[in-house]
Amino acid sequence: MENLTVEKTVYAPLLEQDSILLSVSEGCSYGKCAFCDFANDQYTVFPLEWVKENAKYLAAQSGDKSSVFLLGQNSLSLPTAHILKVLEYVKAYFPKVERVGMYARAEDINAKSEREMSMLRDFGLRTLHIGLESGSDDVLTLMNKGISASEFLEACHKLDSLALSYHLTTIGGLGGKELSAVHVEKTAEILNRTYPASIWQLKLFIWPNTPLADMRARGDFIELSPMEVLIEERELLARLHLNNCFFMDTTVLNQYTIMGHLPDAKSSMIAAMDRLIAGDSP
């Protein structure tokens, strides 16, 4: 039987690269973020029978892998009963799997009751990957993120109370030149009030045919240079006071990777950034 996964490009976190990738949905049900190219894609929810058949196919070649990642940019927005059925398939066809992860938007988490989230956890959901992108409400509004920083914290605190692990992403330079300072300050402030397993600092890429591309063309958004993004990130990292958190950026100056565990590697990562800012090799 052929693989039923039809996504042209697989979007999964780097930390899930060794997981079994099972398609549940494609695209984003929100699709309104100014910086995101998913706004141009059709949002699709794959039928449960389709997911079941794909799980059967993947089970034959999954080997001893112990984790599954449910593909789809915010599959947690699906009805809880639908997700529970998918988790049943995971249990049935991947008996060695110990952990299931997926993407989620903060409002998807807030929309589900604690009972619903507890049921998902009890059926195997262990990890959520969530885009904070910025802790500044000004930046979030500019980018039409559809959620406030306080609502984001509400989602993280719900996960904390349920002992569900989560990984966060932030985007360097998302505030442009005008909002750079507040972007760093507020993002660090929000991150310091959460307990993420990891933070992945992403590079801002301005996709064609997006609202952000239009903003740049009008002169309403002035993009930071790679060095300015690095200086911004260095300030963000210096402001973080987190424990047991893996920090990662694979796009430093478009050519370097900086990663390490907080708090132990904080000083060495900052030192590496300082060398790059000074024009030296890391």
Residue ranges and their predicted role:
Residues 7-50:
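Canonical Radical SAM [4Fe-4S] cluster-binding loop centered on the CxxxCxxC motif
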Residues 60-161, 165, 241:
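Conserved SAM/AdoMet-binding glycine-rich loop
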Residues 150-211, 226-249:
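Conserved C-terminal portion of the radical SAM core fold
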Residues 28, 36, 51, 70, ...:
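Conserved, mostly hydrophobic/aromatic
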Residues 74-76, 106-108, 134-136, 172-176, ...:
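Active-site-proximal loop/turn and secondary-structure-junction residues that shape catalytic pockets
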Residues 92, 117-126, 185-200, 268-282:
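Structural recognition of alpha->loop->beta junctions
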Residues 212-213, 217-282:
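C-terminal accessory regions of radical SAM enzymes
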Residues 136-142, 211, 256-258:
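A short acidic, helix-capping loop that chelates divalent metal ions and anchors anionic groups
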